Amino acid sequence: MNNNMCAATDAEKLWYQIDWTKAENYVKNLQMRIVKAYKEEKYGKVKSLQYLLTHSFYAKALAVKRVTQNAGKNTAGVDGELWLTASAKFTAISKLQRRGYTPQPLKRVYIPKKNGKKRPLSIPTMTDRAMQTLYKFALEPIAETTADPNSYGFRAKRCTQDAIEQCFTSLNKAKSPKWVLEGDIKGCFDNISHEWIIKNIPMDKELLRKWLECGYIETKVLFPTKTGTPQGSAISPIICNMVLDGLEKAIKNVYHKRTVNGKAYFPKVNFVRYA
């Protein structure tokens, strides 16, 4: 047995020896501390805890586990690399390094929509997916803390059924509104300002800019990305949600208590956001 085979065998054993319960608890504990520090407006401590999380072995291992268990685990990015064996997965953990990291361009594909049109989907490499998932662990606690109360798309422990239930709750009373206005933000992911994201999303700014500006490859041609956050990346849904947070309050503030012909009027608007 040569050295490469020995190393692969060792890596396989080490992957199966990881205590995943301990890993989950470690990450969850740090996430709870991030939330506590954020609520107390100790933003320096938030950054320190985020750094600790994103540089920990357990968080990196969990990031690799997540991207090798989801639906896209058999779809490679531009480098053609997949992590299908236990050995490859354990070796991948050591690749998740902040120092010297440069994301590769996204692979652009198109998937059909119900209306017959096609939606662009950008596929990162396995390493980039894992890096985004790793930093998502550090960003998601803040995103969940600041999220609109009735936002249901791409949310932890929320689903389509929750959004439907909230709609039912808002509409099943005798004095409930009789009308529903459905809105759709055209090209939402594609048109978000990079500068707004960099300024307002509380995470590593340099890394965030690299992801936003890495470009995509289509028909073997590299195209730049000057606006938007790509559909298909692990961290984009959270960024999009954080961009839209505050919309519920802004809409409800328009319909505040007022007096009409000497009579107090309490207009009510129910809001449900789902992507």
What does each model-identified segment do?
Residues K13-G72, F137-G153:
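Charged boundary/loop elements
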